[in-house]
Amino acid sequence: MNQPRFKIKELKPINVQDGFLVDGFPSAGFASAIASESLIHTTGFEVAAIIDSDTFPPVSLIKDGIPNYPTRIFVQNELNVAIFSSYLTLHESLHKQMARFMLSWAKKHGIKYIITSIGVRAPNQTEQIVAAGSTEEARKKILEAGIHVLQHGTIPGIPGSLLNQGMLSGQNVIAVLFNSMEQGPDFKSSAQLCMAISKLVPGASCDISTLNKEAQIAEKIIKETDNEAKNLKEGMYQ
């Protein structure tokens, strides 16, 4: 069986040596994607590359009349920060491959920290943010940001794969865990996550006042993209 091949086309110079890579793929409640959108809009990021694969649905997102790939890399070279931003919810069979792809890209560009995130549904609805680190340096960074280090737990998906592979390779990976809602635009979780990322990434900021609007827009686009992908797959086998 052939492994999925992810392709990057860089559109402009990228200089994020010793900086940060933020994983913005949607997770539970869409908060990861929404928080990434807020960082992009608030902190002056620009599209620097597109990511494509034959395993991705053939979907174009039209914004202000301009076609866009649903998965892109945004960069703020002055802050040394890159964001993998996506409106695609990847099937779990692609999670390990995407994690390896991110780690390879991070190594190529000299990234010091990869920041990923995932929503958890805490029984007591706690608002406390916790994080796990792949290395001692990553765990120290978490504590310096005033965030509790997760001591015991299970982290699935792309974040879990990034942690495991980062532990083996020595790449600093920080996985932020936040309390997630089951349904609806996840404004509260997005705000919590965005503030946590801004503590970890110097110079990054969030516009909390616009998060609610961005949450609704991002959720709508992600759901539409998922529906289009589902319809395409169903049409292939009729």
Residue spans for each PLM region:
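Internal, conserved structured core segments that host functional sites
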Residues: E92-K140
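Gly/Ser/Thr-rich loops at beta-strand to alpha-helix junctions
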Residues: F25-F30, L90-E92, G119-N124, P156, ...
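Hydrophobic/aromatic beta-strand patches that form the interior of the parallel beta-sheet core
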Residues: A49, A82-F84, Y113-I115, N172-L177
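A conserved C-terminal secondary-structure "cap"
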Residues: G184-Q238
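Secondary-structure boundary elements
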Residues: E46, L103-I114, M167-N172, L200-A204
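Short, solvent-exposed amphipathic alpha-helical segments in soluble enzyme
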Residues: E37-H41, A99-F101, A191-C194
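N-terminal short beta-loop-beta anion/metal-coordinating cradle
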Residues: M1-Y87
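Catalytic cores of processing enzymes, dominated by hydrolases/peptidases
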Residues: P123-L200, M236
